[in-house]
């Protein structure tokens, strides 16, 4: 790792901010008013925003309904009358203001990537993992209800320009090692606060060797290192992905060759091993073999970090012809309906069901720890979810380990934490 004083306005994320702020350049530490390209809110907090809209602002005009996206994914379908009321409020508001609403279609960030995100856009979402969109070369960042409400009625928001930490990725991941292992390893290296209010930029030939699903994994977990967002330099793979979905791949910003970053890390991908984050800190990352033989009660494959078709293929390959341990509940939640249908077409769902796994509907599911698959006192879960703090997936006296889709699946078969090799 090298540490240097950062030179201004050569770095990709600042070019995105400058575009949104309608200025020629921006500098780290400056505060700018920006035009938001897109706003996303899910059922976790949208009802609170709607209450503020009615009670505090007295029904102002929405700036641009076409920039707004509402997605129900955290508690879908509703698990109690309170959630049902919040969902009804969300539906009614979306209908009244002609806002695009997705219900039961998948996890919010997957829906956004499939249908809305374009390179170079400045996107805000009322969810901390909005940083996912950096995989397509966008600037995605999470905000709270108050900031969301302001942006909804004005079309604008503000940003304190961050410094940037660059992660140069070299080579390719070895067989049996995945982007999930890479990002958990990075978080273990820098710490959960190691990139506080920084941009995590992933670059180098190693980054370009990753497919879109793998890049989504990296950027999605950037916030778990404290980052403002994560971003991968857009390339031909991004252009192909975006244009194949009928969107334009414009504003393909790249950092200048002579850009200087606050820090630069060089990571050899062929040195990454299967890892696990132990309870109750995501940066307590160890070689998966160090926690081998830890008995588990539940395994989960899904969330906005995993649950895409690539992860489901990995799981199906491991599960084919095998059975989930009688002592384990293995829950699988495809990230979206599109992913679910593709998994059906490829025969993956058949493999899951025949193995004894339970295939859930497309939502946040176990990761959210609110409506499906919650774990009880003293129970142990291994998960592809995003967090493992106390009580994240159920009882505060339960234990959550985080691993890759391969490690989670192999563990579900063995009844204890193990790797797929």
Name each region found by the language model:
Residues 66-75, 168-170, 201-203, 232-234, ...:
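Short internal beta-strands
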Residues 39-147:
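Long, structured ligand/cofactor-binding scaffold of large enzymes
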Residues 126-239, 243, 374-376, 380-421:
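Mobile "lid/hinge" segments at catalytic clefts and subdomain interfaces of large enzymes
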Residues 21, 26-31, 62-68, 96-99, ...:
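Short coil/turn connectors at secondary-structure junctions
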Residues 81, 93, 109-115, 120-121, ...:
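Accessory "access/gating" subregions that flank catalytic or transport cores
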Residues 1-7, 11:
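Single conserved hydrophobic/aromatic residue that forms the stacking wall/gate
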């Amino acid at each position: 790792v090298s540490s240097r004083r950062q030179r201004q306005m050569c770095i990709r994320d600042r070019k995105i901010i400058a575009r949104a702020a309608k200025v020629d350049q921006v500098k780290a530490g400056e505060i700018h008013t920006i035009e938001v390209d897109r706003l996303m809110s899910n059922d976790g907090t949208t009802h609170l925003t709607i209450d503020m809209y009615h009670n505090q602002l007295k029904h102002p005009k929405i700036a641009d309904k076409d920039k707004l996206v509402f997605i129900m994914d955290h508690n879908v379908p509703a698990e109690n009358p309170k959630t049902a009321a919040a969902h009804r409020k969300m539906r009614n508001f979306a209908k009244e203001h002609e806002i695009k609403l997705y219900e039961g279609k998948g996890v919010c960030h997957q829906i956004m990537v499939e249908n809305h995100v374009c390179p170079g856009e400045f996107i805000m979402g009322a969810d901390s993992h909005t940083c996912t969109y950096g995989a397509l070369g966008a600037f995605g960042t999470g905000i709270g209800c108050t900031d969301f409400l302001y942006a909804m009625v004005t079309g604008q928001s503000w940003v304190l320009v961050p410094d940037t930490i660059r992660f140069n990725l070299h080579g390719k991941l070895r067989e049996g090692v995945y982007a999930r292992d890479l990002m958990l390893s990075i978080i273990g290296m820098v710490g959960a606060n190691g990139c506080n209010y920084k941009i995590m930029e992933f670059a180098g030939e190693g980054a370009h060797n990753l497919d879109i699903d793998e890049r989504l994994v990296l950027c999605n977990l950037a916030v778990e290192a404290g980052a403002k967002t994560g971003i991968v330099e857009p390339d031909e793979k991004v252009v192909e992905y975006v244009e194949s979905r009928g969107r334009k791949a414009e504003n393909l910003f790249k950092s200048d060759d002579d850009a200087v970053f606050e820090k630069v890390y060089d990571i050899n991908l062929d040195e990454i091993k299967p890892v696990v984050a132990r309870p109750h800190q995501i940066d307590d990352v160890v070689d998966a073999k160090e926690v081998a033989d830890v008995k588990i009660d539940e395994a989960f494959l899904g969330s906005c970090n995993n649950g895409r078709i690539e992860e489901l293929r990995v799981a199906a390959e491991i599960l084919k012809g095998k059975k989930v341990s009688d002592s384990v509940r293995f829950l699988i939640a495809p990230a979206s309906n599109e992913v679910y249908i593709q998994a059906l077409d490829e025969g993956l769902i058949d493999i899951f069901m025949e193995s004894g796994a339970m295939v859930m509907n497309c939502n946040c599911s176990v990761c959210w720890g609110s409506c499906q698959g919650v774990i009880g006192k003293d129970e142990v879960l291994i998960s592809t979810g995003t967090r493992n703090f106390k009580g994240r997936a159920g009882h505060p006296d339960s234990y959550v380990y985080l691993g890759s889709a391969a490690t989670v699946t192999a563990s579900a078969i063995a009844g204890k934490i193990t790797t797929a090799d």
